[in-house]
Amino acid sequence: MLRALFEHKVRPDFLIGTSVGAVNAAWVAGHPDPDGMTELADIWLSLRRQDVFPLSPLTSARGLLGRSNHFISNASLRSVLEKNIPYERLEEASLPVHIVATDLKSGRAAILASGPAVPALLASCAIPGVFPPVTIGRREFVDGGVANHTPITVAIEMGAEKIYVLPVGYPWLNREPTNALGMALHALARIVEQKLDAEVEANRNVADIQVLPALDLADVSPADFSHTKELIDWGYRSARRQLESSNGRAQSAIPEKAKRPLRLDPSPVRAA
């Protein structure tokens, strides 16, 4: 999707991302050019499940026994981020980037726009029960999708008039999860899907909100990294077709029955 946008001369003024979208946004903010998109694809192609979801019998057992608040350590994900994010602090990125996380105590979305990049990204990716919460300052944060996965309201309040939404897509929602990790991702994906519909519907008359096609490969699990190339190629082709058919403008693709709009706390959080 990102490659298709850059090929069609779409250049962002700023980026907002949640969960894996935050990781991609952070990379694009540091390398906002076509070559950067190629490098990002290469990074994803080099990753395996154990690089992000390293299952450990000991950690899992501690979680099951109630001695830990997570099943998977975020140490491997931290290593991936430290190796690849091309700046140490969010404000050092070439483009402004805003990372969405969820304040664990209040349950509200928080926008991380300054401070160390890696902790902010770990917080945005901290799927509750799967990864541990991340402490920034005196507050604990978890995955931004819990509160607000596609922060369209935030983008509008920051002055955006044209917004491109790049949804990951959740084809596995049509299948029953078969393990604890799948159950956690399934629950979060359901929340995300509903909130995307609600936000676009609530703001469609306020800004030009363009939703690119979501990934739609029903046989690919969210924890399966063996189909990364297939997913990247599908996303690129579908986004390119839509952009070409609409003269460079992506088209909204929202179900008719959207949910009620959700409230969002857009207050920035400064990560020390």
Named regions from a protein language model:
Residues 1-81, 113-123, 167:
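Patatin-like phospholipase
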Residues 199-272:
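C-terminal helical/tail subdomains of lipid-metabolizing enzymes
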Residues 64-85, 210-217, 222, 226:
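C-terminal domain-closing interface element
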